[in-house]
Design a protein with these regions (language model features):
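Class II aminoacyl-tRNA synthetase catalytic cores and aaRS-like
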Residues: 1-582
Length: 582
């Protein structure tokens, strides 16, 4: 016995007169009195079937619950001209039912209609994800996900990379986010951790002599959700290369990313090499280390200029400005002011350049006449330009200017939605100051400092740059990477500056530190996020749209009821007791 001879997307005019079998879900039922039409759906498409004129057939078919699973056998016939559906691949034909069998009857009320253009609460969608995934949109997302991963794998293998699976149960290590911990039954009081990334393992593979490694790696981080970040787990194209420089990594991964986006999207994409932007320049020019280069607006630093003025809100402040090549309506300025206030800004000053090159706006009276020409020159202002001003401390001014730049780009419809703009952010600072003025690592502590040991010994730590890099696309960070610090002596000194002792390194990174004392090759790597790539390829507003069974924003799996309580017996086996804390 076979449930089907064809999928619901394969029946065509070539099959007219043939007996076929299909199986799928009942999407719609149309009872026209003497005849009943049903649309049968599987993951490939939809085929229309129609009953014979027999009363018992009509009665049976009309009472099948929508979304039940059925098997239909019948003869393919050509549709009448007036019933042809050009929207369906099978729209020229239909199946005249000889037998229809309900394989799985829906016995519960649907929490929402599948494949209908309606707004459904996310908690319902996630609780009944098995129904949500029946929708054409999510099915197509999963099909695309499978194809993208297969293509990534083919490219990496074709480029000489070896696929290696690394452990899922490992030790806890301080890599930035919180670990998911797994208690050991055998070793009382001890815990495994799910890996935040295969970072140490892939570096150990380089020490092992594996020249070029990759895997589609699951990563686990106990962190808060964002639109582009799902709590719990995510997947990345993890890769590492021995005897590699920063440029070697760029040359290896750029074609992979370019080819993938070109193959699975019709949007425009600039050919590699992708632009390189220094971190400091990115913060100044775009207000972020994840710039959306589709937005042509950029930020100007006017801090030095405004030291000459007496405008109180700008005194002793970092002042950033954004220029727009047009005058804007009063309503536009009011909306931008509302947005600025929502960010915590006291206001949003601006000036408009008139035809005679005079300046007009809320703050023009605070700029001396003799300095206005200087402002026009410094900001390269032209007739009909509008320039916005943001003032705060240096860090906050950059953040706010970046947000204002993004909002202006959206409101003025300057962003080309039909393109992907990639860029490398390079030359990250090795260290930064915490709120308590202590020096800490800015990003990846395993990165090689530019200048090596000499830089660590002679430079101000806050001026040392690292061989760290991010690849960003349309304002989304796809991945971070780095040239690794493979020299134990340089590693000890680098960690010492951040307040760690050699003993700390030996305890927290014992395997890696020990391995590096056995002749480690220089190595570098990166790990583009698969979920984020798919989010961009599908234009999804939330990363959960490209994951089969995601958690909600509270790190809950509403369908499976996770996290959940376990029995006292299970806890006892693990030598764990739960106590209430005040």
């Amino acid at each position: 016995m076979s449930y089907r001879t064809h999928t619901c997307n394969e029946i065509s005019l070539e099959d007219v007169g043939k007996k076929v079998k299909i199986a799928g879900f009942v999407e719609t039922i149309r009872d026209l009195g003497g005849l009943v039409f049903l649309d049968i759906r599987d993951m490939y498409g939809i085929t229309q079937v129609v009953t014979s004129g027999k009363t018992e057939d009509v009665d049976f078919a009309s009472h099948i619950p929508i979304e039940s699973s059925v098997c239909v056998e019948g003869i393919v016939k050509k549709r009448d001209e007036e019933t042809i559906n050009p929207k369906l691949k099978t729209g020229l034909v239909e199946i005249k039912i000889e037998t229809i069998e309900v394989l799985g009857k829906r016995t519960k009320e649907l929490p929402f209609e599948v494949n209908k253009n309606q707004v459904v609460r996310e908690d319902l969608r996630l609780k009944y994800r098995f129904l949500d995934l029946r929708s054409k949109k999510l099915t197509n997302n999963l099909i695309l996900r499978s194809k993208v991963i297969q293509y990534l794998r083919e490219q990496m293998i074709g480029n000489g990379f070896l696929e290696v699976q690394t452990p899922i149960l490992t030790s806890s290590s301080p890599e930035g986010a919180r670990d998911y911990l797994v208690p050991s039954r055998v070793h009382k009081g001890k815990f495994y951790a799910l890996p935040q990334a295969p970072q140490q393992f892939k570096q150990l593979l380089m020490v092992s002599g594996i020249d070029k490694y990759f895997q589609i790696a699951p990563c686990f981080r106990d962190e808060d959700a964002r639109a582009d970040r799902c709590p719990g787990e995510f997947y990345q194209l993890d890769m590492e290369m021995s005897y590699a420089t920063q440029e070697d990594v760029f040359s290896a991964i750029e074609p992979v990313i370019y080819n993938t986006f070109s193959k699975f999207s019709s949007k425009k994409i600039a050919k590699y090499p992708f632009p390189r932007i220094a971190y400091k320049e990115s913060i100044l020019k775009y207000g972020t280390d994840k710039p959306d280069l589709r937005n042509p607006l950029y930020i100007i630093d006017l801090s030095e200029f405004f030291k000459q003025c007496t405008f109180k809100p700008f005194i002793n402040r970092t002042v950033r400005a954004i220029k727009v090549n047009k005058h804007l309506s009063k309503g536009f300025h009011e909306k931008m002011l509302e947005y600025a206030i929502s960010l915590g800004m006291p206001g949003l000053g601006y000036l408009e350049v008139q035809e005679d090159m005079s300046l007009k706006g809320p703050i023009d009276k605070f700029i001396p006449v003799d300095l206005k020409k200087e402002l026009i020159k410094i900001a390269d202002l032209k007739s009909e330009d509008t320039i916005f001003f943001i003032a705060n401390n240096e860090k906050r001014a950059a953040e706010l200017a970046g947000q204002i730049r993004t909002e202006l780009g959206k409101r003025l419809e300057l962003i080309d939605e039909n393109s992907f703009q990639f860029a490398w952010i390079v030359d990250f600072p090795m260290y930064e100051l915490e709120e308590d003025e202590k020096i800490t690592f800015c990003h990846n502590p395993f990165s090689m400092p530019q200048g090596g040991m000499e830089a660590l010994l002679t430079k101000n730590p806050l001026e040392i740059l690292a061989y760290q890099y991010d690849i960003v696309c349309n304002g989304i960070e796809l991945s971070s990477g780095a040239v690794r610090n493979h020299d134990p002596e340089i590693m000890v000194k680098a960690f010492e500056i951040a307040g760690y002792t050699k003993k700390d390194i030996e305890e927290k990174f014992s395997a890696l530190f020990n391995a590096f004392q056995y002749g480690a090759p220089p190595h570098a790597g990166i790990a583009p996020g698969v979920d984020r790539m798919l989010m961009l390829l599908t234009d999804a507003e939330n990363i959960r749209e490209v994951i089969a069974f995601p958690m909600n924003s509270k790190a809950e799996d509403l369908m499976m009821g996770a996290p959940g309580f376990v029995t006292k017996e299970q806890l006892r086996e693990l030598n764990i007791r739960i106590t209430e804390t005040k």
